Amino acid sequence: MSGLAYLDLPAARLARGEVALPGSKSISNRVLLLAALAEGSTEITGLLDSDDTRVMLAALRQLGVSVGEVADGCVTIEGVARFPIEQAELFLGNAGTAFRPLTAALALMGGDYRLSGVPRMHERPIGDLVDALRQFGAGIEYLGQAGYPPLRIGGGSIRVDGPVRVEGSVSSQFLTALLMAAPVLARRSGQDITIEVVGELISKPYIEITLNLMARFGVSVRRDGWRAFTIARDAAYRGPGRMAIEGDASTASYFLALGAIGGGPVRVTGVGEDSIQGDVAFAATLAAMGADVRYGPGWIETRGVRVAEGGRLKAFDADFNLIPDAAMTAATLALYADGPCRLRNIGSWRVKETDRIHAMHTELEKLGAGVQSGADWLEVAPPAPGGWRDAHIGTWDDHRMAMCFSLAAFGPAAVRILDPGCVSKTFPDYFDVYAGLLAARD
């Protein structure tokens, strides 16, 4: 798939089968950093093999962490109290789950570092995190536009003077980065560290993932709802010995959607009713749209209508603040709804791998949908009968755009996905697995 300029999707009618999900990106990169900061050795299984995890692994090795060879999703990491290499230039691609947490960890440890990424990474805001780290006395310099990467870290005087405040309305990754790095400073300073959230915290389920994983590495965070989080002065990460990564719930959304529009059943394994990921709630969205959703320990299964034969999903008007990544799948499913669909509270889309509101608006219109959008919302009216149009779908160097629009193959238009290799960010084999679930139109 890598290197292909485009992929013409075969017209699809039915979808059925079972998919073993790749490891969660959000969990994988968090666990890699926590294992590096923890005392002892951690064997990680089920690790996602993707661009973003390779970026994190390469950065940890460059910082002097002992990282074993990755084989079949397994890797062993020897933790360090602080990174042995105190001067380095790190290239972190477009991996926000690597860039933000590493920025915080490096700033609070001390040293001299330069962090950069691809051009889009340099358009993704980081100013709120930098402002919070500067409250600890961290020396951080913008090497380009203020508020954005690339960054130079070093030269500060780290201290704890009281609670640190961080804006919560732009990205939950800023709070995640501070939480994960705070035990390093709490232990060294001998002081409790309190992080206070300013504004309305978005994407709260991702903070739940962070807190859950920190606890598995021995650090329990005291909290006052979503307003304040305190890390005790004696907090210390300890490797759990062995850590299994659960499947990616955001990736599950595409396959569960296939079951909802292709009849099904489609079952995903690796996530289930006991998942720590908020995006499993997307299954409830599918149920609200009329799909039959079933859960078990470590699996979710969907059955639904056959949209290629005239079946329709129920239209929706919903707040997707808690599941912004899976919400993109809902936007493409709106092509098959029985009326206009509205996605609200998705402002975080603007600062993801691309401006996802603009990108989704543009590509859905190509297929004949009626689309309106605003700062934090998107409304999609399905194409009228006879109104579908053949389309070359731009993916905007965004893995989720490519995977979402694979669902368009169930409509009556010819669909070409441009740059399908962008799925390598999280799921290099996506289109092969997708094809295995489809039955071509008669």
Curated annotation (Swiss-Prot):
GO terms for molecular function: 3-phosphoshikimate 1-carboxyvinyltransferase activity. 3-phosphoshikimate binds at residues 25-26, 30, 171-173, 203, 325, 352. The active site is at residue 325. It is an enzyme of class 2 (transferase). It catalyses: 3-phosphoshikimate + phosphoenolpyruvate = 5-O-(1-carboxyvinyl)-3-phosphoshikimate + phosphate. Phosphoenolpyruvate binds at residues 25, 96, 124, 173, 356, 400, 425. GO terms for cellular component: cytoplasm. PROSITE patterns: EPSP_SYNTHASE_1 (PS00104), EPSP_SYNTHASE_2 (PS00885). InterPro entries: Enolpyruvate_Tfrase_dom, Enolpyruvate_Tfrase_sf, EPSP_synthase, EPSP_synthase_CS, RNA3'P_cycl/enolpyr_Trfase_a/b. Keywords: Amino-acid biosynthesis, Aromatic amino acid biosynthesis, Cytoplasm, Transferase. Monomer. Belongs to the EPSP synthase family. This is 3-phosphoshikimate 1-carboxyvinyltransferase. It comes from Bordetella parapertussis (strain 12822 / ATCC BAA-587 / NCTC 13253).
